[in-house]
């Protein structure tokens, strides 16, 4: 299976983030996906099996986990992209840190495209507006690289207010103790 960089028509690079993740015991996309599930991406818990030792958010913050899952050097994986998108929208993420990491890791085009999808679902959420404003538009991502936009959202059919589709970005639940 080709890497995400290859599917995007980009060359790979020596990644400081990937070196940090590996040094923290997270050596592949599968271990990052396990960590994402442990950190609250329970929506995807049936996607991966097993656990990984969580190095802690002081060593691997959720912003780094998000960009790590979206990293172009891993083998292309729709599940990793979906979990990376969920972690991108985590409630306590620092938008400026996400921006810096996206630039450093050559993920600007991908993060901008996810922000565009996020904004279409949650136009009032400040993260999506910030990323869209700050990241350059380098054109569309080739078809078939990203999962369909509906794979990044949860939709309801019937709510307390009655019938109607309500969409929201899938993001990690807050994990307590």
List each model region and its residues.
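Short, charged recognition helix plus adjacent turn
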Residues: 17-38
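Generic intrinsically disordered, low-complexity segments enriched for polar/acidic and small residues
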Residues: 2, 40-41, 127, 149
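Basic, Lys/Arg-rich alpha-helical nucleic-acid-recognition elements, primarily the DNA-binding modules
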Residues: 1-23
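Charge-dense, extended regions
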Residues: 122-177
């Amino acid at each position: 299976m080709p890497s995400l960089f290859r599917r995007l028509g980009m060359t790979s690079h020596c990644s400081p983030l990937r070196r940090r993740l590996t040094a923290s015991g997270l050596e592949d996309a599968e271990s990052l996906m396990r960590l994402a599930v442990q950190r609250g991406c329970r929506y995807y818990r049936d996607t991966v099996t097993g656990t990984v030792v969580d190095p802690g958010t002081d060593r691997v913050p959720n912003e780094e986990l998000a960009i790590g899952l979206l990293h172009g050097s891993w083998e292309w994986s729709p599940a990793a992209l979906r979990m990376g998108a969920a972690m991108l929208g985590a409630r306590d993420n620092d938008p400026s840190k996400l921006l810096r990491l996206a630039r450093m890791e050559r993920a600007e085009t991908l993060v901008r495209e996810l922000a565009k999808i996020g904004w279409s679902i949650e136009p009032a959420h400040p993260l999506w507006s910030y990323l869209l404003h700050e990241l350059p538009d380098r054109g569309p991502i080739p078809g078939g690289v990203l999962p369909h936009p509906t794979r990044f959202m949860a939709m309801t059919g019937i709510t307390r207010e009655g019938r109607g589709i309500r969409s929201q970005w899938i993001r990690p639940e807050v994990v307590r103790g």
